Each structure stands twice: as structure tokens, then as C-alpha cells.
Amino acid sequence: MTNEQLLEKMSKDMQMRNFSKYTYYAYMHKGKEIIKYFNKPMEEVTTEELRDFLFNYLTEERKLADRSVNYYNSIIRFMYEVTLDKLINKKQLPMRKRKKGVYKVLTKEELSTFFNCVDDYKFKTIFMIAYGSGLRIGEIVNLHMSDIDSKKMRIFVREGKGNKERYTILSKTSLEMLRTYWSKYRKPVKSDKIFLTELDEPMTVGVIRDRFRRYRRKAGLNEKVTMHTLRHCYATNLIENGATLIQVKELMGHSNIRSTMEYVHVANIDL
């Protein structure tokens, strides 16, 4: 099977399993990246070469986080076990055990510095929604105007992680910025999607990440601060302001309460 045929079949395999749009595009994007790295038919890639890719290239050279390395590993497993129908020795390609640590959140001063450095109103609005409503980056690119409920001050999140739908809070600041962005900065094109690129195409995860890194450097923040850090700040704020774990779990779209409980250790509260 050629790599082109592999990608075509992999695409169909994911569609048959009803993967969310975010997962589908992430798997396809990183799948192409993996294929480009080896530069030969994936059927010819050895287990030792896969180990070297995961644990030397991704971990040592690129210094990716354990979560990111495991994501690549999951794609490799899907590629071989499902698409190529080829057994893979998982003991030789183990998932990295994630180190338990405290989520990084930003201080009020750091947040103020960061937002003051963002000189593009569209991206400032995007970052405010991540901070004020706790949306994942993939959920932001899928936002439609019809998802914004200004009467009940909430946002409908379609196709969240695991294809789950939910409602989350729409802050007054986010609503004001959305209205300003829509009326003054967004081009009048025929698309219900809120955020578009400069070419009037749907916004992508990659573009947002690149812009975030640019403004993070401009603000002088630690390189470990990511777009997802804004979501961590949102959850921590909820807990510090009296929200219950169940409420936070639903607003964040967590499938397991244990994910929500990790924010208790970050929040400035007495238990």
C-alpha cells in the first residue's frame, strides 16, 4: 500500500468510526507529518524506527510534552492496527507515563500583559473566548454565530472533545468583543462561522497556535504557557468563585470528574 493509499483509507476508517472533525483533521495532519518524517512506505518502517521517532525525535529533539508524544503514538497505532491491519508490539511502543503536576495558570498581571500585547482584534477575541468561556482551540474554530446565545449568556459547543455537545458561559466581555469584531472587523462573507482567515477561509487550529506563540513571546511568558493555559485559567476561576466540581465538569466538557478535580490543587481556596 502506498502512503497516498494509506492516507485515503485512514480517512475512510475515521469517517466510519464517526471521529469528531477536530480529531479527524488532527490525525490527518499529524499522519502526513509522520509519513513525511520517514519518507518511505509506512509498511516498511520498523518498530525500532518508530521507537526512535517517538522517544528520540519527539521527546529528546523536539522536547514535546508526554501528552503530545502519546498523541502521536495513538495515531501510529491507529495507522497500523486499523488502516494497515498490521499487528504492532505495544510493549515496544509504550505510552509515556505522564508526570503528575499542577496546571500552569496565569496571574492577573500576566494575563493583562498578554492581552495588551495582542494587537489584532480578531485574535484578541479568540483568546478572550478561550479565557472567558474555557473553549478548546478546536471548539473555537468550529464556532458559528448561531452558537452564541446573548439572551441566556451562553455558548453552544458543537462537536467538542469526544463529539460531545455542551453549553458553557458567555462572559460579558466576550460578548462585547464578539459584537465589535463582527461589526467592525469581520468581512461580510457568506459563512456562519465566526472566525475566518485572511483568505476568508475557516480559521484553523494551526493559525491560532502560531499567533498565540507570537504574542506569548512578545509578552515574555514562559514557553510552557500554551493556548490551553487560558482554559486552565477559566476552570480555576470557576472554582475560586464557588462553582461546584460537577458544574465545572459540565462547563469544561470533561468526561471524568478526576480531570476536574486536578484544578482544585491550583485554585486559591481552602478545603
Residue ranges and their predicted role:
Residues 1-271:
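Conserved catalytic core of the tyrosine transesterase superfamily
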